[in-house]
């Protein structure tokens, strides 16, 4: 599901709320979450999961075109850990 599809689905479920308001709310929520992670804070949504940053240590990589070794710096990457309720709901096919 894309962000646009999410907005359409939410707007369809909340017919009394204009689509533009739903779009603004979704965009604001995602922007706030990204900003919170950028500040190094963890986000926990009970029953859904938690978002945090994981550190990737510096390493030697390779340029895929030339095969030359490239030094890659350490960096923080976003990480999502699903909550138990989400894992259980997603496991209906397993």
Curated annotation (Swiss-Prot):
SUPFAM superfamilies: IHF-like DNA-binding proteins
Molecular functions per Gene Ontology: DNA binding; structural constituent of chromatin
Ligase recorded as keyword: no
CDD domains recorded: IHF_B
Gene Ontology CC terms, in alphabetical order: chromosome; cytosol
SMART domains given in the database record: BHL
Gene Ontology terms: biological process: DNA recombination; regulation of DNA-templated transcription; regulation of translation
Pfam family, one: Bac_DNA_binding
Top-rank taxon: Bacteria
Zinc-finger is among the record's keywords: no
Disulfide bridge map: none
Assigned keywords, A-Z: DNA recombination, DNA-binding, Transcription, Transcription regulation, Translation regulation
Assembly and interaction partners: Heterodimer of an alpha and a beta chain.
Family: Belongs to the bacterial histone-like protein family.
Protein function: This protein is one of the two subunits of integration host factor, a specific DNA-binding protein that functions in genetic recombination as well as in transcriptional and translational control.
Protein name per its UniProtKB record: Integration host factor subunit beta
Source species of the chain: Yersinia enterocolitica serotype O:8 / biotype 1B (strain NCTC 13174 / 8081)
